[in-house]
Amino acid sequence: MVGWLSMPEAMITYRGVVYPWHCDHMGHMNVMWYVGKFDEATWQILAAVGASPSRMRTEGFGLVAVEQHIEYKRELRAGDLLTIRSSVLEAWEKSVRFVHQMTNEESGELAAKTVVTGVCIDISARKARALPHDIFRRIASLNE
């Protein structure tokens, strides 16, 4: 199966707060924490399409990030509540592209956005392989 898919509605994949230790010398959340929170959101969307960590371990496959582009839009400060909403932008036989949007829950402002491309690999062979068919079908069903 090869194809382009889009998911029109985003799902909530992360809710959290900015703690003081997330902030740098300028008083806003440091970039390392954006990446970490986006990574947590990725695990949630993967699980939603059937690619849970336990399944990956059991079946010997994984999804590895091969590209990530981040846009920082608004600062987040200690105490800010945030939500990440995620969608699948595209999926092909061996790869998938997600978008995550991080918003300040109180103001509703977009704080950051990232697009991540992941490739499915065979853990033992360390080579790209096809996404399991049921996962590809679940991604497709999100668009229905």
Segments the model singles out, each with a brief description of its role:
Residues 2-83, 89-144:
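Terminal targeting signals and extreme-terminal segments of soluble enzymes
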